[in-house]
Amino acid sequence: MEKEIKYLPIINRSDSCKVKVSDICYITRDDRKLLFDTEYGLKTTYGKMNTVERYLGPEFVRCMSGCIVNLSKVRETKNMIVYFENGKELKLGRTGYVRLKQRFNAYLRKMPPWDDKKDDTNRNEDTDNDGH
């Protein structure tokens, strides 16, 4: 991975802008176009997924060759659909969905209370010698 950046430049014929990386929900590919679905709407530019992926943080997961999802924007995964916090939905194929679900579950396990490594020792300290 290259250096993480805060903004991605989006340049096309009709407009140019910078998109805050943390505002991206997901990125899909349509032929040679990259479609950035953000908190503020859809932005498109020409480019390659591999090029963009190098600059994204660890919360971004490439679940298929043509799709990158920002796990920090995902609210829930269910029935092969990814539900985002802002109400957007993304339907995935089986392979992509399984890959994303595994990574999302691992992402969730890093959040409190599951991330607390002391949890096991605290649980042992909470019980007396009789195991109660």
Where are these regions (language model features)?
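Compact, glycine-rich, soluble single-domain proteins
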Residues: 96-99
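Short, surface-exposed, low-complexity cationic segments
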Residues: 101-103
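Short, surface-exposed secondary-structure junctions/capping segments
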Residues: 61-65, 105-112
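Conserved binding/recognition cores within well-folded domains
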Residues: 1-85, 89-91, 132
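N-terminal regulatory/sensing modules of transcriptional regulators
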Residues: 1, 7, 20, 108, ...
